Amino acid sequence: MSLLEFFRPQKKTSASVAKERLQIIVAERRSQNDPAPSYLPQLKEDILKVIAKYVAIDPSMVELSFEHKGDDISVLELNVKLPDDEK
């Protein structure tokens, strides 16, 4: 290592920048004690659209819940009641 390389700042990779930003977002969410992420309604709608491609389903048949279990554990639970196949 030359003396110039020692004083020249290291160029950050995009992965390290993305990781750093993600850590900031996660820390901010934890500090806000947000009970559920803001994207849950859109997530439920997207899941409902995908299921509707294959099965006729009512929106009330899909339940999505989010729970905090401790400081570093979050649980996303998805319950889908599928209709009975009529033959």
Curated annotation (Swiss-Prot):
Source domain of life is Bacteria
Keywords, sorted A to Z: Cell cycle, Cell division
Q: Which GO terms describe its biological process?
A: division septum site selection; regulation of division septum assembly
Query: How is this protein annotated for GO cellular component?
Result: plasma membrane
Gene3D superfamilies the UniProt entry points to:
Cell division topological specificity factor MinE
Q: What does this protein do?
A: Prevents the cell division inhibition by proteins MinC and MinD at internal division sites while permitting inhibition at polar sites. This ensures cell division at the proper site by restricting the formation of a division septum at the midpoint of the long axis of the cell.
Which family is it part of?
Belongs to the MinE family.
This chain's protein is named: Cell division topological specificity factor
**What organism does this protein naturally occur in?**
Vibrio cholerae serotype O1 (strain ATCC 39315 / El Tor Inaba N16961)
